[in-house]
């Protein structure tokens, strides 16, 4: 059993955590609901995300079970949370005990501020690569969909978190399982979007 904890906060980019949430919960469902996937926030009550979606956390930062995987999303709220000692301290402490720490988009900046990304190779949203690199003590890997460095995994922006999450469940449960999850959620990142040439993969689910 794997326990995933996805940090949320006001201004978090929705797909940064909803994409991995879909991957993790589908993985659990296909394995007879073997895992626990949780949304965690500093406070109770609705969290208003970057584009207006409101979500409710399952637990607060001081009242959740131990985590195997910690995921930190980006969004404009992530830059604000860099000045929040409660959140950065919690990330630092929780990352130290988790088997995996993950960051999506500008969540890499928050992970750098908190500590786990320092001294590591990381990916982030292309618009923030220079800003992250300027912070020092980090190697920004450009043009990489996601980067694995030790037990830290980071991805580019928004939808890239889905690819990162698929890699992680493939590492934890096997590549065949990850392929089954990808087919189940019908995630087909190639070929690129073509407005006048809709296509669909009609292959069955193994």
Language-model segments: which ranges?
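Extended, subdomain-level signal for the structured scaffold at the beginning of enzyme domains
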Residues: 1-101, 108-113, 118, 130, ...
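Class I SAM-dependent methyltransferase SAM-binding "motif I" and its flanking Rossmann-like core
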Residues: 124-126
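A short glycine-threonine-serine/GTX helix/turn-capping micro-motif
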Residues: 151-157
């Amino acid at each position: 059993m794997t326990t995933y904890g996805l940090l949320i906060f006001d201004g978090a980019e929705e797909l940064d955590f909803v994409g991995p949430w879909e991957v993790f919960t589908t993985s659990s469902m296909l394995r007879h609901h073997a895992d626990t996937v949780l949304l965690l926030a500093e406070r109770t009550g609705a969290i208003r995300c970057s584009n207006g979606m409101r979500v409710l956390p399952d637990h607060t930062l001081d009242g959740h079970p131990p985590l195997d995987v910690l995921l930190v999303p980006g969004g404009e709220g992530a830059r604000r949370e860099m000045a929040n000692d409660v959140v950065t301290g919690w990330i630092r402490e929780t990352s130290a005990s988790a088997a995996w720490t993950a960051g999506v988009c500008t969540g890499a900046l928050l992970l750098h501020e908190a500590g786990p990304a320092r001294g590591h190779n990381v990916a982030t949203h292309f618009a923030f690569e220079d800003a992250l690199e300027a912070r020092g003590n980090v190697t920004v890997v450009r043009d990489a969909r996601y980067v694995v460095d030790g037990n830290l995994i980071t991805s580019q922006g928004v939808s890239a978190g889905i690819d990162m999450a698929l890699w992680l469940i493939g590492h934890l449960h096997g590549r065949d399982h990850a392929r089954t999850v990808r087919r189940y959620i019908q995630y087909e990142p190639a070929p690129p979007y073509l407005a006048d040439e809709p296509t669909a993969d009609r292959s069955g689910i193994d």
